[in-house]
């Protein structure tokens, strides 16, 4: 799980996605849940991804987000429509999946069906969890 001397900890690869400009919010979220996620799951299992989470930001959650961020400058509020999270033991599992020919042929092209790929962003972090 990383270099020598690095603690054994899980990593989280987060991908922040904005829907395509010509796509409705409903179509975006339906495509993510009903087309893309089922397409991703076999690859996630094959390459040992520990957990996969899709977080939706829509007309119901956006006003609540605005209430939580009240008084903050608008640029401080993340305006992404969906956040994908892959929990992994090491980045090699994701890197290997990203080289899989079937994954490249099927899943990657599907991202262009629901995401404005020019605005997608990513972040790799490690996890510290507090359970209570």
UniProtKB/Swiss-Prot annotation:
Entry function: Dehydratase; part of the gene cluster that mediates the biosynthesis of cercosporin, a light-activated, non-host-selective toxin. The perylenequinone chromophore of cercosporin absorbs light energy to attain an electronically-activated triplet state and produces active oxygen species such as the hydroxyl radical, superoxide, hydrogen peroxide or singlet oxygen upon reaction with oxygen molecules. These reactive oxygen species cause damage to various cellular components including lipids, proteins and nucleic acids.
Q: What is the official name of this protein in its record?
A: Dehydratase CTB10
The answer to whether keyword Transport applies is: no
Please give one Gene Ontology molecular function term for this protein. Answer: monooxygenase activity
Q: Name the UniProt key words of this record, in alphabetical order.
A: Monooxygenase, Oxidoreductase
The record ties this protein, via SUPFAM superfamilies, to: Dimeric alpha+beta barrel
A Pfam family assignment: EthD
Gene encoding the protein: CTB10
Please state every residue range assigned to the domain named EthD.
Answer: 21-117
**Species per Swiss-Prot/TrEMBL record:** Cercospora beticola
Family according to the record? Belongs to the tpcK family.
Q: Does the keyword Oxidoreductase apply?
A: yes
What is this enzyme's EC? 1.-.-.-
